[in-house]
A protein has these predicted regions:
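Short, small/polar-rich motifs associated with maturation and membrane association
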Residues: 2-11, 15-380, 392-394, 398, ...
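Membrane-spanning beta-strand positions in outer-membrane beta-barrel proteins
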Residues: 71, 151, 220, 254-258, ...
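Surface-exposed loop/interface segments of Gram-negative outer-membrane beta-barrel transport/assembly proteins
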Residues: 177-178, 183, 189, 194, ...
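Residue-level signature of outer-membrane beta-barrel architecture
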Residues: 247-249, 349-351, 362, 385-386, ...
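Transmembrane beta-strand segments that form the barrel wall of outer-membrane beta-barrel proteins
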Residues: 261, 360-366, 607-616, 767
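Hydrophobic, well-ordered secondary-structure elements that form the walls
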Residues: 631, 657, 722, 761, ...
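Outer-membrane beta-barrel "beta-signal"
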Residues: 631-634, 760-763, 963, 1012-1024
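Glycine-rich, aromatic-lined ligand/substrate-binding cores of catalytic
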Residues: 862-895
Length: 1024
């Protein structure tokens, strides 16, 4: 017996030695390819087995591997899985790249996070690292072309100017059309602080974008919610979709410090409204004078008038003189190469109990014109702390300050800068012979260069946004959470006009000064109870109930004065004459009850529902409460057994559907009340007047949203998402016209119905995936059709302004113009289609030179037929490339500026003219669309389709090229990562109409806006 044991012991030892001889130890380290930081908890395993280890806090691992195994599989959440060959020396160091598809799988809704595979609604998530190097100030601009269904329009190219965002079309007449912004689960203020200071048209009329206060480098990801499945949770604020921003948090592990610096320059993205030079304009004016005299002689052949040549020689210097100092190139004088610079630092880290992320940043962006600048100072601190085994507290604090200088724009300004700059002729000199600024010109009464150097329009916006929360796990799966947030903004505006500028001239050639502020605060309290459980490993339930209170307050005031004793004493207190002073204080409140429940069976069948009840102080007690809800479901067909046989080809298939109701409350805080305004002078004393009619029947505007979705994946490399949506907006908030005998033109009420329907396509392909080379492409495409379904039941159309119409069954933004038919080749006169209608509604297509006889008709729309973007992301060893193209087809714009300087001689005596006047008609037989130029002739119609132009375009929107220095270069420096990069925006543009930028304001009306910038940026990012 003892002998048997002895033999067995010897055999066991020999077998152990044999096994040991067949194994080897593989050691190594797993890092992130992005920042060269260690990946803690990455799995390193032998293929086809469960044998493996996880990396430690430094990313290191050690694994016993049989000799027969030649490779290892390395996996980490959010990273591409890597299969690596084991080196002969047994040391395997690898870097994992982000997996775009997997990183986008988490959908953050603000009322819970869901994996993309289980989300029943319509949402797109973008990683912050894809956006951080895009060289623009505002977060919204970074989204352009990155997700289907989202349209972003710049109202101005000046730094920090407000942006307009539409998600799946325009869904309201008078209520807000902008989406709700949510930062770290809390709704925040976005857009502009309405009306600048106290609604003065000339105070900050380009409007500072509040979202420019946010440092994009602090963003972890952005989720865009487009349907009712998740948006209904936000009720009355989510009628136009939701944009959820999640900021960066600290992670467990050693502290990481990152420094980032970049700088560069910008110019106009397109050759903005090219005009004639001095000689070209003089030649055109001379021709126009001759044509005028020819027409006069033809009318009065016996009058003995001077010949056309004599007449033109006599008057040419009245309109196109040759300056003593030479012609002025106003673009060269006024426009500049703008420069920008940015400095950012962040530190993050944590342990088992505490995590933190902190950052500081400074950005300076110059505009294309002097006195157009933006400085941003931003700081952030995000902290989480575990309390015991079940509790957690946290705080997110942001502080930011914007210092902005802007030039006046558009027609609402007293002195819109670009209108003046474009219209001032080369015959006008900037300075006289003594070097002094010329005071004014016949075209505008101002010298634009002098004005931008002596006038100013300054805004300082300070924002503090803080959120604190505390949560506790009452029992397993049941969590109670309390969140309190405070969003505070104060904007201070100051203006000064020299005595000869627009406002100064209007006050009697006296300098004018103005000052104002608007203070805005929002306090939100949210208490929620959530429950999450799994039953029998098949049934998953996730439910939540919440109670929220939102309190909103504004305080604003503005005054302007004139008669200053000196141009150096510009404080309003130094001025003798008070021109105006306005002020207001407003507040509103909303109380909400929120609930949702999600259920799925075996990760195959999903159903979800939500209900929210909002009570708003902006509506009467009878209509104060609104109910908003959604139901949604999904069938994960790819998880069914009958699909497994084709899984290698059709790797995923999901069918989604949702339906629900969102709401929109009035923008006016007291829209249902009758209002009186006081402070009026009545017989030497105080007085008042009725300023708004009451409407106790005012109620919620509601959106009814249907969404159908289909998700497909082929061979785990081609991913297709196709969605159809239908959005009906009913009880539209609208200023209803009433009889002028009431003393009012309109009052706020509910009427009509608006519809948006369309489809979205997103195609994502993994073109190549390997150890050294990865290439991913994403194409997105959107088609949206907007139409008015009904107005008030009595009228089927309403003429809006000079060239828009709201008509049933047509898009909201439809032009209403006389249809231009080109130029008569024999006479050079402009032609128009008659477009009178017979009893059957057919249009008479006869052409006429009498514009007054032609009828205006609905003509084309602002809305494009197709729009989208195409992004490519390439990684090769130490190089990375990201390229985004944007495109738009089928949309149109109206050139209001053309109604001033494209009138064929009617208004151009003292204006400059567009370059396409070189293509004008000059002799019989000329075929062109630019009529004969006759100086001083009667003006044609302003509401002409001649000024309607296509916005079709393709643009290289963003390009980033980076080089990450190899590890062996950095080891001795104590640096974990160093990356050099170039980034650019709006680098190339191909447009069907190239006289101004094709990315026009959301209204479709183009008039004296600063064009967007083409930006080149060079930077370095270093991590320690």
């Amino acid at each position: 017996m003892n002998k048997s044991r002895y033999v067995f012991f010897i055999l066991a030892c020999l077998f152990g030695l044999y096994v040991q001889a067949q194994n080897r130890t593989v050691k190594g380290r797993v890092l992130s390819a992005e920042d060269k930081e260690p990946l803690i908890g990455a799995t390193v395993k032998i293929p086809g087995t469960s044998i493996g280890v996880v990396t430690d806090i430094d990313g290191n691992f050690s694994l016993e591997v049989p000799d027969k195994d030649k490779t290892l599989v390395i996996e980490f959440l959010g990273m591409s899985t890597l299969t690596a060959k084991i080196p002969a020396n047994g040391v395997l160091n690898v870097s994992l790249h982000p997996d775009t598809q997997r990183l986008d799988e988490v959908v953050v809704t603000g009322y819970g996070n869901f994996s993309k595979s289980s989300f029943t609604g319509s949402a797109n998530t973008l990683r912050g690292d894809l956006l951080k190097n895009v060289p623009v100030v505002s977060v919204e601009q970074k989204l352009q072309g990155m997700t289907p269904g989202v349209s972003i329009s710049g109202n101005s190219g000046q730094p920090g100017a407000n942006q307009s965002i539409r998600i799946r079309g325009m869904g309201s007449f008078n209520a807000s059309k902008e989406p709700l912004f949510v930062i770290d689960g809390v709704p925040v203020t976005s857009g502009s602080l309405s009306g600048g200071s106290a609604d003065a048209a000339y105070m900050n009329n380009s409007k500072t974008n509040i979202m420019s206060t946010l440092n994009p480098s602090d963003i972890e990801n952005i989720t865009v919610i487009k349907d009712a499945a998740a948006a209904s949770l936000y009720g009355s604020r989510a009628a136009n979709g939701v944009i959820l921003i999640t900021t960066k948090k600290g992670t467990k592990g050693r502290a990481k410090a990152t420094l980032k610096m970049d700088g560069g320059f910008s110019n106009a993205a397109v050759e903005f409204r090219p005009t004639l030079n001095g000689e070209q304009r003089r030649e055109l004016i001379y021709e126009g004078l001759m044509n005028f005299q020819q027409d006069e002689i033809a009318k009065n052949p016996e009058a003995g008038l001077a010949s056309p040549t004599e007449y033109a020689d006599l008057h040419i210097n009245d309109y196109a003189s040759i300056p003593e100092l030479g012609y002025t190139d106003w673009r060269k004088e006024l426009m500049r190469t703008a420069h920008h610079q940015s400095y950012e630092a962040s530190v993050s880290g944590g342990n088992d109990k505490t995590t933190f992320y902190s950052s500081l940043g400074f950005n300076r962006q110059e505009g294309l014109v002097e006195n157009s600048n933006l400085d941003r100072y931003a700081a952030r601190l995000n902290v989480t702390q575990k309390v015991g085994s079940r509790g957690e507290v946290g705080a997110n604090v942001m502080f930011s300050q914007l210092n902005q200088e802007m030039n006046e724009e558009r027609g609402s300004s007293i002195n819109p800068f670009l209108c003046v700059a474009l219209n001032t002729t080369p015959s006008f000199s900037v300075r006289d012979a003594e070097g002094n600024y010329v005071g004014s010109y016949p075209s505008s009464n101002v010298n634009p260069l002098r004005d931008i150097r002596t006038d100013y329009n300054r805004t300082r916006m300070t924002r503090m946004f803080s959120t604190g929360y505390a949560s506790i796990d009452i029992i397993k799966g049941l969590k109670l959470k309390e969140t309190l947030s405070y969003d505070y903004n104060i904007q201070k505006d100051s203006r000064y006009w020299n005595p000869l500028s627009g406002a100064g001239a209007k006050s009697g050639s006296d300098a004018q000064t103005a000052k104002g502020f608007i203070e805005y605060s929002k306090l939100i309290s949210s208490t929620s109870l959530g429950y999450n459980t799994t039953i029998a490993q098949l049934h998953h339930v996730d439910a939540l109930v919440a109670y929220e209170i939102e309190n909103y307050q504004t305080d604003k005031a503005m005054g302007d004065k004139s008669k200053l004793p000196s141009d150096y004493l510009v404080e309003p207190d130094n001025a003798a004459s008070l021109n105006s002073f306005v002020s207001s204080t407003q507040d509103s409140r909303m109380i909400s009850y929120v609930s949702r429940i999600n259920y799925d069976y075996d990760d195959r069948y999903y159903i979800a529902g939500s209900f929210r009840r909002d009570g708003s102080s902006r509506l009467s007690p009878e209509n104060r409460w609104g109910n908003f809800w959604s139901v949604s479901g999904m069938w994960n067909v790819g998880a069914e057994k009958f699909m497994q046989s084709i899984k290698s080809v059709l790797s995923d298939l999901k069918i989604r559907a949702s339906y629900g109701v969102n709401g929109n409350q009035p923008g006016a805080l007291y829209g249902y009340m009758g209002l009186y305004s006081y402070g009026q002078n009545y017989m030497g004393g105080g007085g008042s007047y009725e300023s708004a009619l009451p409407n106790p029947n005012l109620k919620w505007e509601k959106n009814y949203n249907l969404n159908l979705g289909l998700d497909l994946a082929f061979i785990n490399r081609i991913f297709v998402s196709l969605e159809y949506y239908n959005r009906d907006t009913k009880d539209l908030l609208y200023n209803r016209p009433i009889s002028s005998t009431t003393g009012f033109q309109n009052y706020l009420g509910n009427l009509g119905q608006l519809n948006n329907r369309g489809w979205e396509l997103e195609l994502r392909t993994i073109n190549f995936a390997g150890n050294n080379f990865n290439w991913t492409s994403v194409l997105n495409m959107t088609h949206n059709k907007n139409k008015i379904v009904s107005l008030d039941g009595k009228l089927d159309q309403s003429i809006e302004g000079s060239w828009f119409i709201h008509k049933v069954w047509l898009p909201y933004s439809t032009f209403y113009v006389k249809e231009y038919a080109g130029v008569d080749p024999q006479t050079g006169k402009a032609l128009y289609y008659m477009n009178t209608q017979d009893a059957n509604g057919n249009y008479d297509r006869t052409v006429t030179t009498d514009a007054s006889a032609a009828q205006a008709i609905p003509y084309k729309s602002v809305d494009p037929k197709i729009s989208g973007g195409f992004t490519n992301i390439v990684n090769y060893k130490w190089f990375d490339l990201a390229l985004t193209l944007t495109y738009s087809l089928g949309g149109y714009s109206f050139d209001k500026t053309g109604t001033y300087n494209e009138t064929d001689g009617a208004k151009e005596q003292n204006y400059n003219l567009p370059i396409y006047e070189l293509d004008r008609w000059q002799k019989p037989g000329d075929v062109t669309d630019v009529p004969r130029f006759v100086l001083g002739q009667a003006a044609g119609p302003q509401n002409s389709s001649r000024y309607v132009h296509s916005t079709d375009h393709l643009r290289v929107k963003n390009l980033t090229l980076g080089f990450t220095l190899p590890d062996q270069w950095l080891t001795k420096l104590g640096v974990s990562k160093a990356r050099l990069y170039f980034s650019g925006s709006n680098l190339l543009t191909w447009a069907k109409w190239d006289q101004y930028d094709p990315e026009v304001p959301v209204s479709g009306e183009v008039f004296c806006e600063t064009p967007p910038m083409r930006t080149y940026s060079f930077g370095i990012e270093v991590s320690f």
